[in-house]
């Protein structure tokens, strides 16, 4: 067995220029792994606590030196000599060291950094790619398949400096389409969307995750431009390409109602359901994330009952990758799809348990980035290894997003090489896919052996850990 020889954390910057944590772990066999922790902008009220220094003289009060120090002086000494293969034991030890329900003492960002590093170290010691190790270790799915990518094209709300309310406007290739071709669809739609905006003279830029942020009169205008973009492509709308949205509805609630630019009066929960029904019917929006504020539970139940047969009703702020909240959502039938963000719960073990529970209920899984990302591609391996049905890594733009897509592409290539043939890896699919697209027998032979992985190489470990101090209008249907 390998043993942890040292762990060292430091403060780095995420894609927004806001501090986050990087964690390096080295073992007695010479293997070294490095990982980093993302951070969100629109944060669910029930997420595990991300520890910030709140020192106005350092990084505008958003520093993470306290969390870094917690790793270097509290967590690391407890893990020296332990086998990284004992993930649950190590995660539970860190949870015990913290001793709070929301991980507020050590910080969920500190605990997750170490938890991810431990998983990477175990895979390296086993001489296996991370995704293969995860699949073999946890057996959440019997075989390895590529997920379907959800591509963010445009942003509004807290992710965009414009007058659009919806946080993410997404393009989703149908799951009968090969991964490589689906990546081509995402890239085509992203760049062609910009060309259509330019042709209309729309003023636009990109937001904090890299999606376009045009100034338009309404959310419906944006959908119309997306439809026009699809028409310029070789693909068929509602057969090859569908739309999705992240509403982030908690950011839209005012005095018990929801305000959208599509009409002057705010929407009641019942009226908003009709709005979503029209989005599905007019624009083939089959994926709706956080359609209501997380405590508007009756509205969640209603939309799941009314639209759940044809639409992914996705819980992000509702579930916050939390086991008990997911269990309650299953019992109360408030949604049918789990969005996974490991930093919402704080450990690999807890993340795996939530995925396992959602799977047992017949839900589908979406592995998601955060707005404040790093170049770490950990979640790409986690998505494939846990059999996620979808990934949501943002637009095919900006290095921290592209790193995840490139890792998926690398995994896809490795899987092809192991099978010795050109494959069409498909995810367990969408209810409106072509006949046969969701039949597991239609999939190519699963990968049963790990792709070749590099042998662990000896390297000079980091220094002995030392504690750090603390717009134009378009003609649109009446979607109101």
Located regions from the model:
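Structural signal for hydrophobic packing residues in well-ordered secondary-structure cores
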Residues: 27-29, 71-72, 76-83, 94, ...
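Catalytic core of soluble alpha/beta enzymes
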Residues: 220-438
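Short beta-strand elements
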Residues: 21-29, 35-39, 151-173, 228-230, ...
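Short, Gly/Pro- and small/polar-rich lid/capping loops
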Residues: 1-21
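Conserved phosphate/anionic-ligand binding catalytic regions in large, soluble enzymes, centered on
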Residues: 13, 20-23, 102-125, 148-164, ...
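Long, low-complexity, intrinsically disordered segments
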Residues: 449-480
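Metal- or metallocofactor-binding catalytic centers and their adjacent structured scaffolds
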Residues: 38-128, 137, 182-183, 211
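Mobile "lid/hinge" segments at catalytic clefts and subdomain interfaces of large enzymes
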Residues: 46, 139-140, 144-210
């Amino acid at each position: 067995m390998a043993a942890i020889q040292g762990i060292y954390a430091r403060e780095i910057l995420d894609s927004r220029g806001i501090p986050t944590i990087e964690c390096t772990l080295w073992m007695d066999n010479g293997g070294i792994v490095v990982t980093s922790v993302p951070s969100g902008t629109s944060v669910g009220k029930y997420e595990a606590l991300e520890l910030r220094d709140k020192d106005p003289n350092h990084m505008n009060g958003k520093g993470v030196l306290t969390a870094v120090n917690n790793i270097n002086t509290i967590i690391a000494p407890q893990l020296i000599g332990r086998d990284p293969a004992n993930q649950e034991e190590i995660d539970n030890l860190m949870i015990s060291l913290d001793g709070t329900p929301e991980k507020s003492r050590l910080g969920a960002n500190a605990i997750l950094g170490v938890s991810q590093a431990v998983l990477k170290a175990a895979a390296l010691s086993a001489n296996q790619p991370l995704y293969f190790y995860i699949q073999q270790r946890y057996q959440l799915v019997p075989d390895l398949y590529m997920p379907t990518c959800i591509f963010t094209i445009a942003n509004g709300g807290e992710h965009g400096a414009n007058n659009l309310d919806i946080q993410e406007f997404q393009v989703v290739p149908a799951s009968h389409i090969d991964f490589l071709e689906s990546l081509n669809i995402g890239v085509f739609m992203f760049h062609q969307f910009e060309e259509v905006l330019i042709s209309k003279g729309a003023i636009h830029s990109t937001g904090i995750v890299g999606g376009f942020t045009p100034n338009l009169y309404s959310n419906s205008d944006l959908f119309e431009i997306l439809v026009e973009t699809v028409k310029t492509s070789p693909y068929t709308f509602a057969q090859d390409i569908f739309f999705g949205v992240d509403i982030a509805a908690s950011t839209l609630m005012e005095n018990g109602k929801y305000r959208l630019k599509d009409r002057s009066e705010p929407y009641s929960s019942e009226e908003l359901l009709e709005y979503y029904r029209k989005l599905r019917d007019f624009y083939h929006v089959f994926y709706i994330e956080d359609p209501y504020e997380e405590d508007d539970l009756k509205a969640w139940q209603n939309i799941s009952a009314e639209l759940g047969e044809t639409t992914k009703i996705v819980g992000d702020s509702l579930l916050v990758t939390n086991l008990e909240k997911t269990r309650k959502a299953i019992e109360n039938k408030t949604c049918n799809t789990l969005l996974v963000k490991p930093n919402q719960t704080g450990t690999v073990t807890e993340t795996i348990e939530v995925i396992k529970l959602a799977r047992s209920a017949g839900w589908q899984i979406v592995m998601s980035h955060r707005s404040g990302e790093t170049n770490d591609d950990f979640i790409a391996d986690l998505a494939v290894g846990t059999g996620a049905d979808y990934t949501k890594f943002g637009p095919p733009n900006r290095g921290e997003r592209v790193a995840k897509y490139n890792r998926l592409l690398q995994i896809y290539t490795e899987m092809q090489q192991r099978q010795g043939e050109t494959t069409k890896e498909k995810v367990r699919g969408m209810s409106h896919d072509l006949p046969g697209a969701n039949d597991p027998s239609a999939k190519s032979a699963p990968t049963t052996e790990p792709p070749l992985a590099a042998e662990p190489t000896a390297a000079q470990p980091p220094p002995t850990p030392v504690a750090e101090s603390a717009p134009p209008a378009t003609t649109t249907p009446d979607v109101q």
